[in-house]
A protein has these predicted regions:
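Extracytoplasmic/secretory soluble proteins
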Residues: 2-517
């Protein structure tokens, strides 16, 4: 992952659902019934006079933002008065694995690090980090020291972040799901009276209509792999995106398969080939292919649709608005009616350094942050009038502030986001967020192997070669250098390279994971 891509991913994660307040959300008893996690205290009250002054240092993945000093001054002024605490940020602008290496190095050197942003994409499992002494066991501390925030999670949420029965991460409260959607220009849907899109066949009808009616517009773009595009539609859960490992939602044995060995693999490749053959993709000289979706592409209006994930349209429309574009906007249409995998709340959560003496104070800070809209707004959006401007039913950056440095892209936000407090950034967004949340509730769930991270150390050479081969195969498909004989050769080559041995090792670990859970 290069640094440009980190910026794009950061913007997507931060902006993805930047809206919504408690007013339109149905709050429910999230932890009803007997449960070992339920705190006995009623409401958590902070008495700053009885607290020793404490400074906390948080590590985040992202670039340094010039406004961080101003935001910290404002936050710490209120935080110190109410909890006798001050916080500091350390932002590391690197790939996740190097970010983790830096954290480990700083902890070993004795530098202040009380907590850090955790990613499921780290090259080591949470269990390994715990065994190596980098993360604290929060099973009891979470409900005891942040009871108000803890009560905002359902039991399914809490169960989904357990590792061998223990909690090591304080999750954010923003529900995400890898739900594949066609994200289309809604003005063109209405202009040409195109029927609602409910599946890939409907989407292809849309593409054909755009090609015929508006030949100056490129019908579609996607920046994904075959497994990323189609696993959902055929009832598969993706275990490893880069390696193309999947299993069926309805398989009680949770049998792991290589994507190319599924019965739908060739159909998926042929479908992508048809998009190229039918003229739906970008033409560059004599080549036809795809491109990474960027701001210039979104604002040019030259593409009528993209295949992405539910929630991407919030980011796309926010970009249009910052550029003053109101002639069109993007709307998502789900491409299947089945379930999609809900992303673990551990993603972008907060892990506490096991060597820190301030674990309870970190949790106290989180409970303070999540206790009121006022505290949340100050940390997430800064000072009103200086870092954001209040409109009728939304907020936006002040004039002249670029998206890269606005509250959209502050790296310290992601681990603490809460759907009950998020502010809308465009008019009418609250209603769209309510629809998003409803889809997440009804059409996504935690998969059977949620939280499982395979250890590939015993099959590392097979893994490395497969990762390259899978990427090369996907590239050959989207540039049109593909036929069924090439798929047959790829399947054979992967078997010869030992993919069955890799799958068997991952299956062994997955079976043990399920038994332990």
């Amino acid at each position: 992952m290069n640094k440009k891509l980190i910026i794009i991913i950061s913007v997507v994660l931060i902006v993805l659902i930047a809206g919504g307040t408690a007013a339109f959300l149905l709050l429910r008893d999230r932890n009803g019934g007997e449960d070992e996690f339920l705190p006995t205290a009623s409401d958590f009250e902070i008495d700053a006079g009885n607290l020793k002054f404490t400074e906390l240092t948080f590590y985040f993945l992202g670039q340094e933002i010039p406004t961080a000093t101003e935001v910290l001054q404002a936050v710490n002024s209120k935080l110190k008065q109410e909890t006798n605490t001050e916080i500091h940020f350390k932002c590391i602008y690197e790939r996740p694995e190097y970010y983790l290496d830096k954290i480990k190095s700083d902890i070993a050197s004795g530098l202040p690090c009380d907590a850090f942003q955790y990613f499921n994409g780290f090259p080591v499992s949470m269990e390994t980090l715990a065994n190596e002494g980098y993360v604290a066991d929060l099973t009891k501390l979470f409900p005891q020291s942040a009871p108000n925030y803890f009560r905002q999670f359902s039991q399914d949420d809490i169960d989904s972040i357990k590792v061998k029965g223990k909690v090591y991460v304080i999750p954010a409260r923003i529900p995400f799901a890898n739900r594949v959607c066609a994200i289309v220009r809604q003005d063109l849907m209405e202009k040409y009276n195109i029927p609602e899109i409910k599946n890939y066949s409907d989407y292809e009808n849309y593409l054909e209509t755009i090609k015929e009616k508006d030949p100056d517009i490129i019908p579609m773009n996607y920046y994904d792999t075959t497994v990323g595009l189609f696993a959902d539609a055929y009832g598969y859960v993706i275990l490893d995106y880069q390696l193309g490992l999947v299993y069926k939602w309805d398989d009680p044995d949770v049998k792991i398969m290589a994507w190319e060995q599924t019965p739908v693999y060739k159909d998926c490749l042929n479908r992508i080939r048809s998009w190229k053959d039918n003229g739906y993709l970008m033409k560059n000289g004599r080549n036809v292919g795809i491109a990474q979706i960027d701001q210039g592409m979104l604002t040019s209006g030259r593409w009528s649709s993209y295949i992405g994930r539910l929630g991407d349209h919030f980011n796309y429309n926010a970009i249009l608005r910052t550029q003053g574009i109101t002639e069109w906007n993007y709307k998502p249409y789900q491409l299947n009616d089945g379930f999609s995998a809900r992303i673990s709340p551990m993603e972008n959560g907060t892990a506490i350094n096991a060597k820190s003496a301030n674990a309870e104070r970190v949790l106290l800070f989180i409970d303070w942050l999540e206790a009121s809209q006022e505290n949340y707004d100050l940390y997430m959006y800064g000072v009103k009038g200086k870092h954001y401007v209040e409109k009728e039913d939304y907020i936006e950056p002040p004039e002249g502030v670029t998206m890269e440095y606005s509250f959209f892209n502050w790296p310290w936000k992601a681990p603490f986001r809460n759907i009950d407090y998020e502010r809308a950034n465009t008019p009418g967004l609250k209603g769209e967020i309510a629809q998003y949340y409803d889809i997440i509730e009804k059409k996504s769930k935690y998969p059977p192997l949620n939280g499982f991270v395979p250890d590939y150390s015993t099959v590392d050479s097979i893994k490395t070669l497969r990762q390259i081969s899978v990427s090369d195969m996907d590239r050959s498909v989207y540039i049109g250098d593909y036929d069924e004989s090439k798929a047959d050769a790829f399947i054979k080559d992967q078997k010869d390279a030992g993919v069955d041995n890799l799958v068997a090792e991952v299956q062994r670990q997955a079976d043990r994971f399920r038994k332990d859970r």
